[in-house]
């Protein structure tokens, strides 16, 4: 085949991708934005469903379920954390066995089932907003079973849908690679549109009509999302696994760690073969090999059929190890991020929420400000700031993903500082008007005081969360793209669990509701301001640690065709 004809085929067909019939995917009729918008639509519906439950969950727990503020906040953080850690399992199933498409369909069925049971449990529990008596153990068990069934559905849905969407763009094609970077921006914008709709519509229904209806509407939206996803099948590109490999990527990479550990004490005199090392490794001697590179060696006394690990597998394993320090530092962002669905909402309950005579804003609805700031800023970032940055840095994305993440971490620190100052003002207002021991009395302080912290958190999300999605997707081996997004989600999940643990320990140390707890159920006697200052320090320390680590990070190389 001539070079010209080979180039023509590469332009017409996508390497390592097939269409719905299993044939090589044609660039002109599959993938890119025609397929991506189907998948983005699915995510809008899923986020509508998720936030239709989660955004006002603390109000349901402290209302109809009769839990204290500290216990409810811990339960929300625990559910949120587990929901974003379980995708590691879903990604494993998708990347090792079922593939993204089938995993999404199965996970969606589980998701719908969980929402249906959740609706049933809310229908059976009295629709109280004030605590009178706790529901029966059976109804409590049904509610939490349903809630965690939804989390299991999310485990397969969340990492695979976004990875499947990004798969519609060929990273080896310069134009499609640039479009893929835009995809992550528009994905997040559209996702926030679904979140905003849920916060405005579903939360209002939950607060003013019925919790059962408020949980039932998300269930209907998830059914719609599943139908929409299947309708777009003919336009999708499906990733091919490496044909020469008989084992799944987890087995190959796991073998690298096993062999490397076994070969740690080997030196050059013990070797009978070294797997050929590509590119910049070709000049390395055995003594210079790092821990994982020892997997490229075979000892003299090995069995006849024993072979060294392939250099590609070692590179894949090394890429995963490099992500660990970055992942750890992003936890400093994830812990403050967990607060907007819990304590931000509880602050709003105590404040003046009337916008028109007889019309009050549900406290959880203020979360829509995060979505609004994202919807407003993403187009500016994608269409204005990225081209400006591209002209200066020559980077197709404007700035590197790590710089984008770091910018968001700075904004998150600022968010916590502002939140602490606003909470101090709220406590001063309660003291000034003699309302410290009247927690159910509305303070003469507008809920719009919370506006800056919500908007700042939205700007931080545009940088850090979108940056993390693109970073972890692009830096893992091609066959593990679902895992890459699950790694990003797990950081947010572990952050939520750490937040829950931190709340528990601080509540224990400061005496609970009987003492001067920072999280006293009477927020006028609590000290959320102290907690926010603590989180500001955690976030700042995390940022400087991230800055140190990111300077030495080596990005994964992509071969462009």
Curated annotation (Swiss-Prot):
InterPro entries assigned to the protein according to its UniProt record, in alphabetical order: MFS_trans_sf, NRT1/PTR, POT_fam, PTR2_symporter_CS
PROSITE patterns in UniProt: PTR2_1 (PS01022)
Residues that bear Phosphothreonine: 103
GO MF entries: dipeptide transmembrane transporter activity; tripeptide transmembrane transporter activity
UniProt-listed SUPFAM superfamilies: MFS general substrate transporter (SSF103473)
GO cellular component: membrane
Keywords for the protein's UniProt record, in alphabetical order: Membrane, Phosphoprotein, Transmembrane, Transmembrane helix, Transport
Superkingdom of origin organism: Eukaryota
A Pfam family hit: PTR2
Membrane topology of the entry: Multi-pass membrane protein
CDD domains: MFS_NPF5
Residues annotated as transmembrane: 78-98, 104-124, 133-153, 183-203, 211-231, 324-344, 361-381, 405-425, 447-467, 486-506, 530-550
Tissue specificity statement from the Swiss-Prot or TrEMBL entry: Expressed in roots, flowers and siliques. Detected in stems and leaves.
Compartment annotation: Membrane
PANTHER family in the cross-refs: OLIGOPEPTIDE TRANSPORTER-RELATED
Family recorded in the similarity comment: Belongs to the major facilitator superfamily. Proton-dependent oligopeptide transporter (POT/PTR) (TC 2.A.17) family.
Protein name (record): Protein NRT1/ PTR FAMILY 5.13
Gene designation per UniProt: NPF5.13
